[in-house]
Amino acid sequence: MTLNSRILPLAISLMVWLSGAPGFALSALEIMQRVDARDDGDNMTARQEMILIDKNNHRRVREMIIFAKDEGRDTRRLLFFLSPQNVKYTGFLTYDYNSGDKDDDQWLYLPALRKTKRIASSDKSAAFMGSDFSYADMTRRLISEWKFKILKEDEVRSKPVWLIEALPASDIIRKRYGYNKSVIFVRQDLFMVVRAVHWVSAGGKLKYTDMKTIEKIDGIWTATEIDVKTTKARKTLHRTILRFRDVKYNQMINPNLFTVRRLEKGP
């Protein structure tokens, strides 16, 4: 055997190992576990601007304020609409449980009716306040509810990403989230989801999510502009732009803020 015949297979193996290292050093599940474990602070406050754009490019702008706080392994979130007048002081409260044995709790307060509506699990795939986000999108996905597979590597805005397929682990999960499948783009240096495509169960629609702007705030990488659009047959049906400002982490937040009573009281 010649020297070249011994070296060539070794060189090819080394090239394959080096080029494949980012994709094969971790499994899809391990990557998503790191995404889930990424630091997002013990609590957070922010102002939000939600822009709703219909298929005729008509725009509606809504202003909101949001509070979030970890309670052990669970998370609680409270959101109030501040404008326009027709949704002013509408509130949304979520308890995210870090257990597949218990459904997340969600309540929507409608001040015009002076009524609080509890969101049933069967309704969580419905649109949240006319946006491209569903009620299920407003909660945190549990890793145990999905089956993951690495599809390939690519780049988003010149940064290496993994493309990971996420399939619901059961028909119950599929119905709850309203997605047959998702492809998630995870930035390799941050273990942060920066883009996603969702195959909507009803109506043959696709939903595209893009973290347009990412900033480091208080040491935490944060998506400060999120663009979501719903399409069918390659035509955009609706689009939602969500912009964050005045984001603050690890502030003093009263845990009594996250109650139905406080939801009904308003900001």
Model-identified regions with their sequence ranges:
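Short, solvent-exposed mixed-charge patches
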Residues: 266-267
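Sec/Tat signal peptide C-region and signal peptidase I cleavage site
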Residues: 21-25
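Gly/Pro-enriched, hydrophobic low-complexity segments
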Residues: 82, 93, 105-109, 117-119, ...
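Bacterial N-terminal signal peptides
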Residues: 9-20
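Ribonuclease/tRNase effector modules and their secretory precursors
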Residues: 33, 50-51, 58-67, 71-73, ...
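Bacterial N-terminal signal peptides that target proteins for export
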Residues: 1-11
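N-terminal mature ectodomain segment of secretory-pathway/periplasmic proteins
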Residues: 26-112
